[in-house]
A protein has these predicted regions:
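Polybasic/polar functional segments that serve as interface/processing modules
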Residues: 1-104
Length: 104
């Protein structure tokens, strides 16, 4: 069984956009669709003193965002079984949140 896993930091996103949990839920669903994954259910969103996490568990992978809105920080974590391409999901999230991928 083959899979791909990508973790990317997005920059240039306004803190107001990152503070919208409904918007974060919507982009995780859109990212999963772009990768070709079907969700098990709705995204789970949890907020705490170190930011907000949105997690979408899917058949064949996951889409997770880790956000600290006050710092305009968004880390995207996508795992997909082949032939899914996590980069497609990251591109969808970057486009919808109006962020730029920070290459390592």
């Amino acid at each position: 069984m083959s899979y791909s896993h990508r973790v990317t930091q997005l920059t240039g996103i306004t803190s107001a956009r990152l503070a919208e949990t409904d918007g974060l839920s919507a982009v995780t669903i859109a990212a999963a669709a772009a990768v070709g994954m079907s969700p098990y259910g709705p995204p789970v969103v949890r907020s705490g003193p170190k930011g907000t996490v949105t997690c979408l568990l899917c058949h064949g992978g996951h889409v997770i965002t880790h956000v600290i809105a006050e710092q305009s920080l968004c880390i995207v974590d996508i795992l997909a079984l082949a032939p899914g391409d996590p980069e497609r999901g990251i591109d969808v999230i970057a486009k919808r949140l109006k962020g730029q991928k920070q290459e390592r």
